[in-house]
Amino acid sequence: MVSFTSLLAAFSVVSGVLTSPIAVVPEVNTALAKRTPSSTGTSGGFYYSFWTDTPNSVTYTNGDAGKFSVSWKNNNGNHVGGKGWRTGSARTIKYSGSYKPNGNSYLAIYGWTRSPLIEYYIVESFGTYNPSTGATSKGQFTVDGSVYDLYTSTRTNAPSIEGTRTFTQFWSVRRTKRTSGSVNTGAHFAAWKKAGMNLGSHDYQILAVEGYKSSGSATMTVS
């Protein structure tokens, strides 16, 4: 099976099947701003990004501070969204909440870099599809209480934060799934560099829930 990330690329473009980046909008404290499909902006002091090609099947809601929720049922398309930072860095990211996928879905730290153009995932949990399928193994390392397997894959002429491009995906996939904890992104970046996986200059970085042709729900808080 082809990973749904191979069908979608990033959400500011917005993770995977996007055609063009969506402009950042200022924070607005209204119910409309809290439930806006296919948008990016700020909410509760955090950057957020959400995209879906099936708005009638999925609902994304921004909560206070770093909280967000997403629910989807019999979704025949794709969706991805979450909260984090407009500019990524080697920060420690704390998160907690409820993640209940039924089918193909990821819970991950997700981001992009430029020069080189890299799309990256630190996968903390997933549904029925393991993202390592079809990817190239680059080793493993241990951090935050678990072994993570490292992989790379290539996207050819795919949507990205720089338009349609060919680029590399970096993956860290946690062996022991979890829905709360701390992610030392700096340790992942160092392990990737040691494995010859070199990042560029950081673009956005979020805790994301992604789904493809599945059902499920999640309520997460990031800090």
Curated annotation (Swiss-Prot):
It catalyses: Endohydrolysis of (1->4)-beta-D-xylosidic linkages in xylans. Keywords: Carbohydrate metabolism, Glycosidase, Host nucleus, Hydrolase, Polysaccharide degradation, Secreted, Signal, Virulence, Xylan degradation. Residues 34-223 form the GH11 domain. InterPro entries: ConA-like_dom_sf, GH11/12, GH11_AS_1, GH11_dom, Glyco_hydro_11. GO terms for cellular component: extracellular region; host cell nucleus. Pathway: Glycan degradation; xylan degradation. Residues 174-184 are annotated as: Nuclear localization signal. Disruption phenotype: Decreases virulence during cotton plant infection. GO terms for biological process: effector-mediated perturbation of host innate immune response by symbiont; xylan catabolic process. Its main location: secreted. The active site is at E119, E210. Residues 1-19 form the signal peptide. Endo-1,4-beta-xylanase involved in the hydrolysis of xylan, a major structural heterogeneous polysaccharide found in plant biomass representing the second most abundant polysaccharide in the biosphere, after cellulose. Acts as an effector that localizes to the host nucleus to contribute to the virulence process. Induces host innate immunity responses; triggers BAK1-and SOBIR1-dependent cell death, salicylic acid signaling and jasmonic acid signaling. Does not exhibit any cell death when transiently expressed in N.benthamiana. This is Ethylene-inducing xylanase 1. It comes from Verticillium dahliae (strain VdLs.17 / ATCC MYA-4575 / FGSC 10137).
